[in-house]
Each structure stands twice: as C-alpha cells, then as structure tokens.
Amino acid sequence: MQKRLTLLGSTGSIGDSTLDVVTRHPERFAVHALTAHRNGDKLVAQCLRFAPDVAVVGDAETAARVEAQLRAAGSKTQVAYGKQALVDVSKSDGCDTVVAAIVGAAGLAPSLAAARAGKRILLANKEALVMSGAIFMDAVRDHGAILLPVDSEHNAIFQCMPRDAAEHGGIAKIIVTASGGPFRTREPVTLASVTPDEACKHPNWVMGRKISVDSATMMNKGLEVIEAHWLFGLPSERIDVLIHPQSVIHSLVSYCDGSVLAQLGNPDMRTPIAHALAFPERVDAGVAQLDLAQIATLTFEKPDYARFPCLALAIDALEAGGVASAALNAANEIAVDAFLSRRIRFTAIAQTVDAVLSGLSNRTPSGLDDVIGADADARRAATAFIDKLPAPSVERAA
C-alpha cells in the first residue's frame, strides 16, 4: 500500500532530498500535502510535479500568487496559508506519514499535531524535541504515533540500537559524531571576522543557511544531544560528542560488553530519509555505495568547547532542564538571524545565547503554553541584548 505523505518544509534541503527519494519509488509513496513559507515559485513547481491535494504557505499574499499560478497551469491542488493550515495538513486523514522538516520553532505545532493524530512521523525538525521533549514524547506514546528520526546522526543511532528500550539493551552510551564544521581548525581569534557566506560553506553537507550556521557554531550538535536524550531516553552523561571530519561514520552506540556499533555511509541526507520512509524495509536512495578503500583514512578528535561555546551551552541547558532548552533554541534563532543579516558578529551568537540563559528564570513547564511563553521571553531577551551590541565593522558588513 502506498504511504501518503505530508511534507512540512518541502522547499528546503530536506524537502528536496525527500522528494528525490519519492520520485524513485512512485509505487510506494504519494504526496498529500506540500508546505513552504514564502518560496512560492518553487512550491508551484513541486505541486505541478507531485500533484498534492493541498499546498500550504505562510501568508495570504504568497497563497494568492501560488493559487493563481497553479490554476493557470490546470492544477487542482488546493492552497491554504497560516499556522492553522500547517496543523490541519499534519493531522489530516489524507496522510499517514508526516515528514517534519520545517526549520526552527515554527515546526513545533504541526509536528505535535501529527503526534496527537497518531501519525508516522519522520522527524527532521529537532526543535520539536529541544523545545518540548517530554510533552512531545508523551504525545507520541499516548496517541500511538510512530517516531522515526531523519537527522543523519539520530537515524544512525536508531539503526544501531536494539528495538527494545535503551535501559534493557545493554547500552553504555551513544556517540554523536560531528564534522566540526568549516571552522574546526581556524584560529579562534579570527572567528569574530567570519562572514555569513563563510559560515554557510559546510565542508561535507548541503544544507540551508540557518542549519549551516548552527553547524559552524556547533549549536547544531548541541541541539542533537538534546534531541538524542529525548529520542533514546539516555541522560547527558551517556551521550558523547566526537569530531569526525570525514562525516562517514554518522554515529555510534557503545555497549556494556565492549562492542561498538556504527552506521557508515556517504554524507547524503537521502540515505536516512529513505531508511525512515521505507522502514522496516530498505529502498534505493540514489546514493553511491561507500568505498572505504578510496576514503582510506577516518580521523577523530574530541570537541574543543572553548572554540565552540554553543555546544557547551546546549549541554548545560539539557542538564538544567525545565524551559532552558526552549530558551536556548529561541535565543539561538534570533542570534543566527541577526548574524545572517550582518547585524552581529559570528562570535556574538554564543554571547547572545549565554546572556539569555544567564538571565533565565527557569521552571518546569506544565504544558505547551509554558514552552511557548519561555520561547517568546527568550526571543525578547535576545533581541534586547543584540540591540545593545556594537554594529559590525563596515568592512565586514560590506
């Protein structure tokens, strides 16, 4: 039977990779809904190719433009817009599988709606777990949803773990690998002069600009540690980070008998996406087979927390509990946006997050409203902190 997909964030890099896999297996997968924020032209092209029942965009103006283009092309795809429309297509009876690939906090509500509707969720939006881990996992359990990780690291861990609970599997720890990003060997004193274009040039992966900056600061890896905690039920002291510049080993699981299982593959997001789409089966992802003889050398090193303070801040937030992770994520989103807009220096991203967490009145959230409130408070605090920072130099901003 065909799986019917709602693809949240179809115009991003994860969306592109997902649709590439779908194209290879039309007998297995059909598209119910595609969503984008404002990239209407690309969404129209996707709709004309995959003929979804529904297309969702962020605002009325984009919706009107998309609908006009679709009607002119003879498409019957219905067009909706706004936050509620995202929730609606995520819980719709027209789909059984939701690929959650919206970047940032905007992906929380539709991902949670999919969980509460008992959907099969392919989770690429790590913020859903970073912001509301306990709430999200409770919804998955209580409503019979199936949660499959799409992030390459978490998908690798999932493949290396037994199907029963972590506490019964003899697991000693999980090891999340990281490339180290574009600045792994760059002199720390020069990081203040990093430009957005430099930060977005990842050595191994093709990603969107926001996640590329997160990789450059290693905040992305910190968020992945938090996500791993919720996905696999392990405390922070049993989750290690290991720098692996070649991005061939995507993560490892260490067992109490001394065994270590690892998942290897070329750095291509189509592999974990295809695994999650077809699970428990396997399908062709269009990815070349790994040639270890050609690679020849795999190297590893411990992370430098002084070079990457965002990684340390994320682990601190996980250990603090409460709404600290939600505040961390919100402050980081504001800071990264400011950096990409050339309003702050690269090094000010960590400074902003640190300032927000230092001023946080932490508390245990009683529900989603508390999480959303903490997110809003952190965004205001981050914005206020950034407004007080000196503007970057003219040379850098040019």
Swiss-Prot record:
Enzymatic class: oxidoreductase
GO biological process per UniProt: isopentenyl diphosphate biosynthetic process, methylerythritol 4-phosphate pathway involved in terpenoid biosynthetic process
GO MF entries: 1-deoxy-D-xylulose-5-phosphate reductoisomerase activity; manganese ion binding; NADPH binding
Chain positions recorded as NADPH binding sites: 11-14, 38-39, 125, 127, 208
Binding positions (1-deoxy-D-xylulose 5-phosphate): 126, 152-153, 179, 202, 215, 220-221, 224
Cofactor or coenzyme needed: Mg(2+); Mn(2+)
Keyword terms, alphabetized: Isoprene biosynthesis, Manganese, Metal-binding, NADP, Oxidoreductase
UniProt name for this protein: 1-deoxy-D-xylulose 5-phosphate reductoisomerase
UniProt pathway: Isoprenoid biosynthesis; isopentenyl diphosphate biosynthesis via DXP pathway; isopentenyl diphosphate from 1-deoxy-D-xylulose 5-phosphate: step 1/6
UniProt-annotated binding residues for Mn(2+): 151, 153, 224
Family membership: Belongs to the DXR family.
Database matches in InterPro entries: DXP_reductoisomerase, DXP_reductoisomerase_C, DXP_reductoisomerase_N, DXPR_C, DXPR_C_sf, NAD(P)-bd_dom_sf
Reactions catalysed, as given in the entry: 2-C-methyl-D-erythritol 4-phosphate + NADP(+) = 1-deoxy-D-xylulose 5-phosphate + NADPH + H(+)
E.C. code: 1.1.1.267
Function: Catalyzes the NADPH-dependent rearrangement and reduction of 1-deoxy-D-xylulose-5-phosphate (DXP) to 2-C-methyl-D-erythritol 4-phosphate (MEP).
Alphabetized PANTHER family for the sequence: 1-DEOXY-D-XYLULOSE 5-PHOSPHATE REDUCTOISOMERASE (PTHR30525), 1-DEOXY-D-XYLULOSE 5-PHOSPHATE REDUCTOISOMERASE, CHLOROPLASTIC (PTHR30525:SF0)
Taxonomic source organism: Burkholderia thailandensis (strain ATCC 700388 / DSM 13276 / CCUG 48851 / CIP 106301 / E264)
